[in-house]
Amino acid sequence: MFRYIEKEARDSITAALEKLGIKVPPEIKLEEPPNPQLGDLASTVSFELAGKLRRAPIEITADIMSVIETPEIFETIESKGPYINFFVDYGRFSSRLLESIQDDYGSHPPRDERVILEHTSANPNGPLHIGHIRNAIIGDSLARILRMAGYDVETQYYVNDMGRQIAMIVWGLLNLDGDLEDYPGDKMDHRVGKLYFEVNQRLKENPGIRDEVDELIRKYEAGENEELFRKVVEYCLSGMEETMKRLHVHHDRFVWEGQFVRDGTVDRVIESLRKTGYTGENDVLYLDLEEFGLEKELVLTRSDGTSLYSTRDIAYHLQKSEEGDVIIDVLGSDHKLAAEQVGIAVELLGGKRPEVIFYEFITLPEGSMSTRRGVFISVDELMDEAHSRALHEVKKRRDLPDDVADDIAESIGNGAIRYYIARLSPEKHIVFRWDDALSFERGCASIQYAHARACKLLEKASFTGEEDIEDGWKPEGDERELVRLLARFPVVVEESALARRVHPVAQYAQDLANTFNSFYRSTPVIGSDFEGARLRLVDSVRKTLRNALNLLGIHAPETM
RNA sequence: GCCCUGAUAGUGUAGCGGAUAUCACGUAGGACUGCGGAUCCUAUUACCCGGGUUCAAGUCCCGGUCAGGGCACCA
């Protein structure tokens, strides 16, 4: 409906300009005025035309106003200075909007564009920690947004099963006492993390271990110890998957990088790169990208002939190029240089250059995290803490059976975490503080509460969905603002998908909840003259809040 | 040293070159609590510095300052 009123506004201006014999600019600019006294849409065409016509904007506006015809969806068109302001007829508009809102509100028709979206892809050398969480939450939310916007999306987790880090864990298994089960921790990924930490300690004391690890890598690329490597990775990954499941983060496919070495793809990639003429060789084979503005050459193979992460990544990206129309990667900004090198290499070989979404780091107040040094807060810890704090809040307010309270607490805890990350633009550096991440007084819990409140109201009124919208219903004030915001939701989805951004959805959910709460205070629903219309409105808010939260991977409980 | 990214109220944050800069927390008042108070209303305080482009700059360009990151035969 929002797009519809934009179109009506543009059409009316176009018609007016044609009537005046003025050449119509390619795009008629519209914006949303800063306050309701200035209407619902405003156009700045006169500013733009002023330069070309050598006339004052205000005069051009006056001319347009003299001939413009008001489309039926608008009540009036007025000029405020040089602006042309459109005022929506909220009686007509609101009814039409409510008729159009279904369960899947916000969804766009299929776009016939396949997106391969890689995210999380943390190394299986320990549990996910809060440094990884940003990748997972941005990636998963973006996948949901793209799907709602009509894209065909496949999410992939790229599993590093052959890097030095994994080889170190295998070394530990071969050389230290005890099997993985003997390491402390409830979850498999935590045990692997402990072992990894242990091996790092040994390595510090005895640098000679490094050669042994190199030997393991070499042998593995030649096909030895395959089961052992696989076992370690699967073991760790299964623990990580549990965590992601609890966070509501989903991947359609796990792609193991080792496959690209074993099936010869990496060798073929290296051969093809040689043929491009951009490679050079001393002890190692490298790619010289100076011509593309990158001073640092990209090393493709170690001196012992084994491959490197980036080399395998090139092979992986060529595969993704085959699978999708649009390739999106979510990466920490520390990968900027490497990603640029890989992107250029992929293009050299005729693949599609990925769009990369970079995010800045999450650090602890005392500094950065490190799996190697054992300094991190795991996502499991974070979620447990979120749950127990949320449970405390739930119990403080209401007396509920334990299992119900538990479910609600889980939704609220998860919501707090996901919202904490999703609401920020990715280029902001985050310093993690427990009380910021887990605040229930406001933030996500208040959005979930607005949803629960809507549910309760509908239940109380025995809402069926068949209620009629009364004649003469014409929203004003808070109610009008609520209608306006509802109409915007599909636009927010579309724009977020196009910009590959998640946080506008988070902001929108907050705005909608706030506006609904104000409306709830100021406007009676049950027993009012417009009970039918308002119940339909509340139901529409309910659906929209639920769908918006769902885009962020957050569950909206019906009671809390 | 070179490269990338940030800088907006006490704190955290949004902002397509356009009319009075968003939201949240905090603080201080207040409301109502008969559709659930995890509520509502009011007040409060901000675009790092210096140049430039433009009818119009928080937004674009150049130069500083501060902060984070990168510049591996790690990933």
Swiss-Prot record:
InterPro entries hit by this protein: aa-tRNA-synth_I_CS (IPR001412), Arg-tRNA-ligase (IPR001278), Arg-tRNA-synth_N (IPR005148), Arg-tRNA-synth_N_sf (IPR036695), ArgRS_core (IPR035684), DALR_anticod-bd (IPR008909), Rossmann-like_a/b/a_fold (IPR014729), tRNAsynth_Ia_anticodon-bd (IPR009080)
Assigned EC number: 6.1.1.19
GO molecular function: arginine-tRNA ligase activity; ATP binding
Span(s) of short sequence motif 'HIGH' region: 122-132
PROSITE patterns: AA_TRNA_LIGASE_I
GO cellular component: cytoplasm
UniProt key word Nucleotide-binding: yes
One Gene Ontology term from the biological process aspect of the record: arginyl-tRNA aminoacylation
Record Pfam families: Arg_tRNA_synt_N, DALR_1, tRNA-synt_1d
Catalysed reactions, as listed in the record: tRNA(Arg) + L-arginine + ATP = L-arginyl-tRNA(Arg) + AMP + diphosphate
Key words, A-Z: Aminoacyl-tRNA synthetase, ATP-binding, Cytoplasm, Ligase, Nucleotide-binding, Protein biosynthesis
CDD domains recorded: ArgRS_core
HAMAP family: Arg_tRNA_synth
Family membership noted in the UniProt record: Belongs to the class-I aminoacyl-tRNA synthetase family.
Protein name as catalogued: Arginine--tRNA ligase
Species lineage: Archaea, Methanobacteriati, Methanobacteriota, Methanomada group, Methanobacteria
